[in-house]
Amino acid sequence: MINNRLKMAIAIFIVFSLVYSIGFITPMNSDDYTYALRELSFSGVKMHYLGWSGRIVSDTISTSLLKFFSPHIYNAINSAALTLMVLCWAIIPAKLTRSSPSPYVMIFLFFLYFIANPAFGQTNFWLVGSANYLWTNMFIAIYILISICVSNGNRSNLMLFVYVASSILAGCSNENT
C-alpha cells in the first residue's frame, strides 16, 4: 500500500507536470515583451507603480522572471507557483480538521480550477497575467494557510516570519485583497 506522503508527492508531480507541459509550449505575448524590458530599480518600480498599475508585487515578479530567467526556467517557477497554490488549497481544510491533506482533494481542486477558470491561459500561462493573478492568489493562499497554523498554536520564529511576510505580500498584491 502506498502511504499518503508518497501519494501527495505523486499528486504534486502530476499537477506540476501538467502545468509545465502547457506552459512549455506557450509563447511570450502581449505585455511580456514590455515587462521584459522594464527597469528593475527602486525608481523604475516606483515610477511604474505610481504612474501605471499600482501592483507593486506582481509587476516586480513579472519583470524579475522575464529579465533574469530563460523561458524554460520561468515556466518551471510559474508552474511551481500554481502547484503551491493548489497544494495550499488542499492543506487548508486538513489543517482546519486536524487531518492529513488528501492527494485526491489536491487533484480534484486542480481540475476544478482548470475547468472553472474561464481565463485559465491568461491568468496562468501568460507570464504577466500569471504574476497579476496566479502569484497574488498564491500569496493569499499561503497567508490563509499560515494564519490557520498560527491560530492552531504553531508560533515558531520561522512560522511568524512567514506569517508577516505573507501578510505583506498578500495585502500588497492586487484587488483581491
Where are these regions (language model features)?
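Membrane-interface helix-boundary motifs at transmembrane edges
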Residues: 2-3, 91-102, 150-157
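Transmembrane signal-anchor helices characteristic of membrane glycosylation enzymes that use polyprenol
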Residues: 4-30
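Extracytoplasmic catalytic/substrate-binding loops of multi-pass membrane glycan-assembly enzymes
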Residues: 21-40, 49-61
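Short hydrophobic/aromatic helix or loop-helix immediately within or flanking a transmembrane segment
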Residues: 48-79
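Membrane-interface micro-motifs in multi-pass membrane enzymes
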Residues: 55, 103-148, 174
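Transmembrane alpha-helices of multi-pass, membrane-embedded glycan-processing enzymes
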Residues: 62-65, 77-89, 136-139
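Transmembrane-helix motifs of polytopic, lipid-linked glycan transferases
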Residues: 80-104, 142
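Membrane-interface alpha helices of multi-pass inner-membrane proteins
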Residues: 159-177
